[in-house]
Amino acid sequence: MKRVLTSVVLAPRNAAIAVIGLYRRIVSPLYGDVCRYYPSCSAYGLEAVQEHGLIRGGGLAVWRVCRCHPWAEGGIDDVPARQVQQYRRTRYGFVVAPSHGKG
């Protein structure tokens, strides 16, 4: 029961991860390497949502996109680290409970 509840709670986060992944594969290559920051804004957004969830990670991603403009200095801007890791990432980037897929 707990695994099902965890999967339901993580569904919006994983849906956002899928949308960002599609953007990175389809739209981002059309623009080329135009981001002034490292990692790129889409990579930052993906990691922020994976690490902090849809609300806080989405907020971090929006703030990052707002700071990325032609007059920005740019540079290295990593996603703030989370204190405690609650979930693990699959090889496809989706977030699952630590015990998901084991035993």
Swiss-Prot record:
The keyword Membrane applies. It is found in: Cell membrane. GO terms for cellular component: plasma membrane. Its main location: membrane. Keywords: Cell membrane, Membrane. InterPro entries: Membr_insert_effic_factor_YidD (IPR002696). It comes from the Bacteria. Coiled coil: none annotated. It is a peripheral membrane protein. Could be involved in insertion of integral membrane proteins into the membrane. Belongs to the UPF0161 family. This is Putative membrane protein insertion efficiency factor.
